[in-house]
Amino acid sequence: FSSLFKINSLKLNPGDKVLLERGSVFSNQFLQIRDSGTKDSPIVIGAYGEDELPCINTNGQGIWYQDYDNPLDSLTHVYRGYVSSSILLYDTEYITVEDLELTNKGNDIIGELYSCIDKMNRTGVAVVAKDKGVRCGITLRNLFIHDVNGNVYDKHMNNGGIYMTCFKPNNVELTGVPRYKDVLVERCTLYKTSRWGIAVGYTYAHDKFMGA
């Protein structure tokens, strides 16, 4: 693929492989995947060739809306808003993302300095579980994630290198509680990622854990 925009419009099926050519650079682009593989036939997002890792420089694109649909334990904590992610895996399972370089830089020209309180939330990889219960078989392997200039204040929003969250489902009686099973993160290198390196959030149900 020479552009990621076509990939975002594809319907991916179990066993499909989306391979980016090594040495290629995708500026102001992103991937948003909402399809799932199976245990025996996972979807693979990866690379081919012999050069450097293919690089996705998102630069604040790939915007989606995060909403825990539940106020947090402090009125000062932000629980909903827009997020920019190089790769978004939304309610997917049995998917492998490997052999990629990801950046998501801020823009000093419009005032996105390190400590700007209104800075865009940013991640390298965002993984979300919401309306399909248990999400299994998420593998992130050999990713080089750096220069992700997220918001250092909004700790419950998706900010950092890799951020996995569970959101309040629309119908918990029908779908069950969203959660993950069999998650593997291996041989990933992260640096200069704010606010977090690798983080997991289950914040929508915070009231069930406070004081436990």
Predicted regions: what is each one?
Residues 42, 46-51, 93-104, 133-149, ...:
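Right-handed parallel beta-helix
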Residues 30-33, 61-88, 111-131, 153-180, ...:
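Extracellular beta-strand/beta-solenoid scaffold signature
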Residues 1-30:
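Acidic Gly/Asp/Thr-rich repetitive segments characteristic of extracellular carbohydrate-active
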Residues 17-26, 34-118, 147-153:
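Right-handed parallel beta-helix/beta-spiral solenoid domain characteristic of secreted/periplasmic
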